Regions:
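N-terminal Rossmann NAD(P)H-binding glycine-rich loop of SDR-like oxidoreductase domains
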Residues: 2-34
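Structural motif
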Residues: 11, 75-76, 112
Length: 120
């Protein structure tokens, strides 16, 4: 992988690449020759199966300090992350993660966020 600071125009950040939709989107973007960086809580779980040329960085949308390096130089971000916590904590964690990501993306100058909503 390369350093997040090596980002150039057209860089895409993909969150949720270890999930069903994210994994397929990663493959499709890579097949189209897109430059893709993936944010993962456990990068080792993704790095071994990511297509060649994919940059995998550690981060968590609930930990704001991990987002700025991942978003550096990104043009478009795909937000495919949703909390799977049980009970009342689910909604608050999901909101907090999305809010953190949106604020960090705005600060980083990300031009477009594609948000996948999958729950009722």
């Amino acid at each position: 992988t390369t350093s997040p600071n090596a980002a150039g125009p057209g860089l895409i950040l993909l969150t949720g690449a270890t999930g069903y939709v994210g994994g397929r989107l990663l493959r499709a973007l890579s097949e189209r020759g897109q430059r893709v960086r993936c944010l993962a809580r456990r990068p080792e779980a993704l790095a071994a199966r990511a297509p060649a040329g994919t940059e995998v960085v550690a981060g968590d949308c609930l930990r704001c300090e991990t987002l700025a390096p991942a978003l550096a130089g990104v043009h478009t971000a795909y937000y495919l992350v949703h909390s799977m916590a049980a009970g009342a904590a689910f909604e608050e964690q999901d909101r907090a993660a999305a809010r953190n990501f949106g604020e960090a993306a705005r600060t980083a100058g990300v031009r477009k966020i594609v948000y996948l909503g999958g729950l009722g």
